[in-house]
């Protein structure tokens, strides 16, 4: 049957996408680019003949520039939690307000959340960090997403499990939310942090999942419950939907058979701009050092 591939950056990504390519094997296939009802790019691929190999390769060149994740405007009526969406907007957001799950553990967590009047930013920061601190992150290779009750009972979850739990919590609290999947790009910092974690020890990228909440005036704002931080320049969205099933990187059907799945991701810095933390390249530093020794 047809294979649906969701590995092209979404139209709304904040990072500048300079180029994108998708290569598929076997080369004898039909491909049609589409957009789903939520504006995400889909590649529909059909193979006219049976094959024992299905290979997908994507190449992406993007400009990563640091931005302030809190740099957005919020309409006056939505600056404090709780707030109500305007009637017309609420109708448009209906799929993102639909409650899919409930249960004693989910209800208990909702009861534990401070729902007194406070700025919406403070509320979202606290809720996002609550999940990050309450759950242990794990790499879970099983397909699908855990139910909220299962996640809260186990107190451990993959990124997609945490993202779905946050979606449901937000909806129960009256806030429209959607499930986002994409690439997470983490670059090794130029200098070590003196007052907190320094981040990754080497450049890294992988598929990731997070949550987006709709704030009047700001639009969709990303929350990453895995890290407890707001989504930044390293979050490259591929697909955002009301439910996780619509955001899977690849979906389709195959005949019963034995199969093996492998995947590999890598990141390369093509060009770097001078910055305060790295004003010179390593070669330039060596030249400066050599000149200094010569002067001495």
Regions found by a protein language model. Name each.
Residues 161-169:
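Short amphipathic alpha-helical face segments that pack within enzyme cores
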């Amino acid at each position: 049957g047809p294979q649906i591939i969701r590995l092209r950056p979404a139209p709304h990504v904040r990072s500048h996408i300079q180029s994108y390519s998708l290569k598929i094997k076997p080369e004898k296939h039909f491909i049609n680019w589409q957009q789903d009802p939520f504006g995400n790019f889909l590649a529909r691929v059909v193979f006219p003949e049976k094959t024992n190999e299905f290979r997908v390769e994507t190449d992406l060149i993007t400009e990563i520039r640091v931005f302030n994740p809190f740099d957005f405007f919020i309409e006056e009526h939505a600056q404090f939690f709780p707030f109500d969406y305007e009637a017309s907007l609420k109708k448009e957001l209906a799929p993102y307000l639909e409650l899919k799950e409930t249960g004693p553990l989910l209800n208990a967590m909702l009861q534990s959340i401070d729902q007194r009047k406070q700025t919406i930013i403070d509320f979202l920061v606290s809720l996002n960090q609550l999940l990050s601190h309450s759950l242990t992150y794990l790499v879970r290779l099983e397909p699908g997403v855990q139910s909220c009750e299962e996640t809260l009972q186990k107190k451990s979850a993959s990124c997609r499990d945490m993202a779905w739990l946050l979606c449901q919590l937000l909806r129960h609290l009256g806030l429209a939310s959607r499930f986002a999947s994409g690439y997470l790009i983490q670059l090794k910092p130029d200098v070590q942090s003196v007052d907190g974690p320094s981040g990754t020890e080497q450049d890294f990228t992988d598929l990731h999942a997070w949550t987006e909440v709709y704030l009047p005036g700001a639009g969709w704002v990303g929350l990453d419950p895995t890290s407890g931080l707001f989504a930044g320049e390293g979050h490259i969205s591929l697909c955002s939907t009301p439910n996780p099933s619509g955001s899977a990187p690849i979906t389709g059907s195959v005949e019963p058979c034995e199969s093996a799945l492998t995947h590999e991701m890598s990141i390369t810095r093509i060009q770097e701009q001078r910055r305060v933390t790295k004003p010179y390249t390593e070669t330039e530093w060596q030249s400066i050092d050599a000149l200094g020794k010569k002067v001495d």
